[in-house]
Amino acid sequence: MSNRRSRQTSNASRISDDQMIDLVSKLRQFLPEIHERRRSDKVSASKVLQETCNYIRKLHREVDNLSDRLSQLLDSVDEDSPEAAVIRSLLM
């Protein structure tokens, strides 16, 4: 009985090929390197997923760098100044 139940759950959580194509197409729109290519250029789903992971890593690095810069800026201004309050709000 539990085997049957797990198969039903497994089938229910799977996405269809059409859903996968739609998701990959949506991801493609967010990737600058792939989005700039002509629509006629075929890009595999695995390439889109790989580029998505690379792009997310790049965005994480940019966020880290910006946080570091804001922290440095915060250290250079008066703690009670309006500028410091704005910087603190950006870091939160």
UniProtKB/Swiss-Prot annotation:
Pfam families, per database record: bHLH_ILI
Biological process annotations from GO: gibberellic acid mediated signaling pathway; regulation of DNA-templated transcription; regulation of growth
Listed GO MF terms: protein dimerization activity
InterPro entries: bHLH_dom (IPR011598), HLH_DNA-bd_sf (IPR036638), PRE (IPR044293)
Gene3D superfamilies named in the record: Helix-loop-helix DNA-binding domain (4.10.280.10)
Domain bHLH: 4-59
Keywords: Gibberellin signaling pathway, Growth regulation, Nucleus, Transcription, Transcription regulation
The keyword Protein transport is annotated on this UniProt entry: no
Main subcellular location of this protein, as a coarse class: nucleus
Record SUPFAM superfamilies: HLH, helix-loop-helix DNA-binding domain
Record-stated family: Belongs to the bHLH protein family.
Role summary: Atypical and probable non DNA-binding bHLH transcription factor that integrates multiple signaling pathways to regulate cell elongation and plant development. May have a regulatory role in various aspects of gibberellin-dependent growth and development.
Something else known: Plants over-expressing PRE5 show long hypocotyls, pale green and slightly narrow leaves, elongated petioles and early flowering. They are not sensitive to the gibberellin inhibitor paclobutrazol during seed germination.
Assembly notes: Interacts with IBH1.
Annotated protein name in UniProt: Transcription factor PRE5
Organism name: Arabidopsis thaliana (Mouse-ear cress)
Lineage per the UniProt record: Eukaryota, Viridiplantae, Streptophyta, Embryophyta, Tracheophyta
